[in-house]
Amino acid sequence: MGEEYKKTHTIVFHTSEEHLNSSIALAKFITKHHSSISITIISTAPAESSEVAKIINNPSITYRGLTAVALPENLTSNINKNPVELFFEIPRLQNANLREALLDISRKSDIKALIIDFFCNAAFEVSTSMNIPTYFDVSGGAFLLCTFLHHPTLHQTVRGDIADLNDSVEMPGFPLIHSSDLPMSLFYRKTNVYKHFLDTSLNMRKSSGILVNTFVALEFRAKEALSNGLYGPTPPLYLLSHTIAEPHDTKVLVNQHECLSWLDLQPSKSVIFLCFGRRGAFSAQQLKEIAIGLEKSGCRFLWLARISPEMDLNALLPEGFLSRTKGVGFVTNTWVPQKEVLSHDAVGGFVTHCGWSSVLEALSFGVPMIGWPLYAEQRINRVFMVEEIKVALPLDEEDGFVTAMELEKRVRELMESVKGKEVKRRVAELKISTKAAVSKGGSSLASLEKFINSVTR
């Protein structure tokens, strides 16, 4: 006989550098509890295979980068207007390479499932034509999944563009949400991005299942609405919360970061941490407002202020700000180890862009939040954080701009007020639930077992 097939070989296909880390966390979560399963991550991310392999550092997980493809001129000219279109189009242009990769893998392994990020919706056509069971990976929460699955209903019932609706939207398992808080990609029905999301939502219903980065206790109402068919027929759901199951990074690197040494000198729960993701850059005017608000709040702070490499941070901030706040503040424009910062005893609050991974990390370490959404699905995440689970305070902003007075007010409210204490109490409760979900007998591990059974039966 020829070379024996491995018992199970799961393929994870992801699109962008931003979502690659979530795919790696999912792969590690699966192999940690099912070491006999081999996983290959196929990605269009612009990363060297050797570098990604170092990050993965797991013999059961193989990384395979697809060869870059030339982008059509009409797409490259549109990148700055709507970068999300690129997230969908690159995987679509890679379909031929994906098919080749799957055929190559199938010669040595028994492919049991293909897990695709929603940006890789175009891969659904390839996998179904090859009779490979296909699962969608939603790196956001169940709230976001509800929004996707409700998109066809909005498409049929809303006349014109959602951008012009200016009204409340009712969705099962949701608090009442304003149309302006829906993801901007759903705003204009004639755009390619709108059509991509609509097609993705329809394919999700036809898939073998949907993996969601959340846990039952966190999004019980949304989970019940989905399970009870309030969003129409859906495939099996697997709520895994795999990113919170991922352990801290190795201490070799992070111990060298000076912000952690600075935190060691601060009182317990006294520091407000401001971090807005890899794309969270602000205008010079907004940076000054943040600085003024922090200084007037009187609170200790650790602030990651992202700027272009050629810019001088000191010149962008109010004159004398860094020297006046030297004893109570730490400002940097380079990478900081977010998990290690959030887990530090000195950190008592987190001003966040409401990216889902950041929200889960904050909850897992019991850190209350102030929500400042910037892009993608972050506005709907803020509604969930503030209205549904009550673990954050909102920042009032107009067209994304936050005044110094508003920031000062919310920081004081979180760190000093009775309302802030209530948010902290709720976060402390969910910290326990977060840990329980990924512990023995927890809901996420139970969901993982159901998923493994579905692909190995």
Curated annotation (Swiss-Prot):
The active site is at H19, D117. It catalyses: 2',4,4',6'-tetrahydroxychalcone + UDP-alpha-D-glucose = 2',4,4',6'-tetrahydroxychalcone 4'-O-beta-D-glucoside + UDP + H(+); 2',3,4,4',6'-pentahydroxychalcone + UDP-alpha-D-glucose = 2',3,4,4',6'-pentahydroxychalcone 4'-O-beta-D-glucoside + UDP + H(+). One of its GO terms (biological process) is pigment biosynthetic process. It is an enzyme of class 2 (transferase). InterPro entries: UDP-glycosyltransf_plant, UDP_glucos_trans, UDP_glycos_trans_CS. Keywords: Cytoplasm, Glycosyltransferase, Transferase. UDP-alpha-D-glucose binds at S139, V336, Q338, H353, W356, S358, E361, E377, Q378. Coiled coil: none annotated. It comes from the Eukaryota. GO terms for cellular component: cytoplasm. It is found in: Cytoplasm. Its main location: cytoplasm. Expressed in petals. Not detected in stems and leaves. Pfam families: UDPGT (PF00201). One of its GO terms (molecular function) is UDP-glucosyltransferase activity. Glycosyltransferase involved in the biosynthesis of aurones, plant flavonoids that provide yellow coloration to flowers. Belongs to the UDP-glycosyltransferase family. This is Chalcone 4'-O-glucosyltransferase. It comes from Antirrhinum majus (Garden snapdragon).
